[in-house]
Curated annotation (Swiss-Prot):
It comes from Mus musculus. Residues 110-137 are annotated as: Disordered. This is Uncharacterized protein C3orf22 homolog. Transmembrane segments: none annotated. It is found in: Cytoplasm.
Length: 137
């Protein structure tokens, strides 16, 4: 007769399994080797969710807002002091022809007009800088 096959499991093993099953029931997360997952939330989870709901204020009038306000709506336009808005300094004379060309291509009303170029015919316009192209597209 085979004596090893008919042995009962020892009490220590039974107690260990029972303790493990109790632990699994109290543990809030599902373990992959459990037989059946419980559909109800553990009591500690219910207690936490109720207490958090009680602490939060009820906010019924939440309105979506824009992070960048539409001009004319929302915050008023800020009028900066005069010291912050000062006209740019006059450009150096060596780049005057470039600025004239830019003014012709991109006219703006808020910039002051540059004085006309007054150089002798035999002198180059600038020293060391190439002349502007003869034809303006």
């Amino acid at each position: 007769m085979d004596s090893k096959g008919h042995k009962k499991p020892c009490r220590h093993k039974k107690k260990e399994i029972k303790t493990y099953e109790r632990f699994v029931k109290k543990f809030p997360y599902r373990l992959p080797h459990l037989t059946e997952p419980s559909t109800s939330c553990p009591p500690s989870c219910k207690a936490k969710s109720n207490s958090l709901k009680d602490k939060l204020p009820l906010q019924k009038n939440l309105v979506p807002t824009r992070s960048i306000p539409i001009p004319g709506l929302g915050a008023p336009q800020v009028a900066w002091p005069f010291s912050f808005y000062s006209p740019p300094p006059h450009p150096p004379l060596c780049n005057l022809w470039e600025l004239k060309l830019l003014q012709l291509r991109f006219p703006t009303q808020d910039l002051p007009r540059l004085p006309p170029l007054q150089t002798p015919d035999n002198q180059p316009l600038t020293s060391g800088i190439s002349k502007p192209p003869e034809s303006i597209p």
